[in-house]
Structures are given as C-alpha cells and as structure tokens.
Amino acid sequence: DELYESKIVYRTKGFEDLVRTFCMNPKGVVVNENTNGIVTVNGHSYEDENKHTENTNFALLVAKHFSEPFKDSNGYGESIARLSNMLGGGVIVQDMIGKNLSELDIPTLSATPGDLSLVMPKRILDGIIEMIYALDKIAPGTANDDTLLYGVEVKFYNMQVEIDNNLETRNKG
C-alpha cells in the first residue's frame, strides 16, 4: 500500500520550535502562487498520469508565536516573502548545500538560483534544515545533494478570533 500524505511534526533541538510537513505531493510539481502581488511557492499533484514527475514536493512550515507587544505576524511573513521577491524576482531555489544551481537542476518551476539564508531568519531556516535531516532518517534520500529548497511559502493564519458572549464575531453575515 502507498501512503499519499504524511503529517509529520518535529520539535527542533535548539529553540524547540515546531516544524511540520504540509501539502505533500507525490509525483508533484512546484508552482508559483501570486497573493496580493507577492510571488510565493506552492505545489500540487495532478491526477493525470501524463503530468506526473519523479519528484515529491512538500512544504515545511515553522510555527512561530510572538510575544507581546508584537501583533503583526501576517506582516512579518509577508515581509519575508517580499524580500524573496526583491532578491530573486520571485521564488528563490537552492540545493541542500547551498551551491549555485544551473538551469538543468531546476525541474518544475521557473525560480532564481540563490541563497535562502539571505531571505529567511536564521532560526526558521535552521529549523527547516534540521527537519530535513530528521526526515532523512525515516525517509532516506530526503537530505540528498539533489534536494532542492524553494522559498518562500508563507501561510497566513489568524490565531485568535474575537467573539462576544454569544460566540459571535463583530462581522455580521
């Protein structure tokens, strides 16, 4: 039997951040996504076998909860995505060891070879790399030299919704 999508959560050693797999796409492709004029990376699989690839792609999301007085986590994520757009004209791709890539190395997405450490905060990128090596222990080959890292994918979540005593929000409708 084949397992289509694994949900794996890892706690990093240094900061105890939670890193999780998201949106696994066996035989999938990496694609650009445009949200409010910001180009980010995403992925999907096709049902049509003619569109299958030899690759599996998935996102690794690092959960970050900020302390007071910080209130704009969506703005923080958006600024990281905008920095990727500024440095790479959109999505940046690098291999696991950070060497320069050729066009032949980039299989399914038009992306700019670059250095994600110039875009992502160290703590977040370290968590992603640590998770990849942890995944390699249960899925050998995950941390190979031909593993490509695309960035950035940002998910925007509102962690709290204000409700009244009737469990209703201020938004009517």
Language model features with spans:
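Residues forming the flavin
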Residues: 1-173
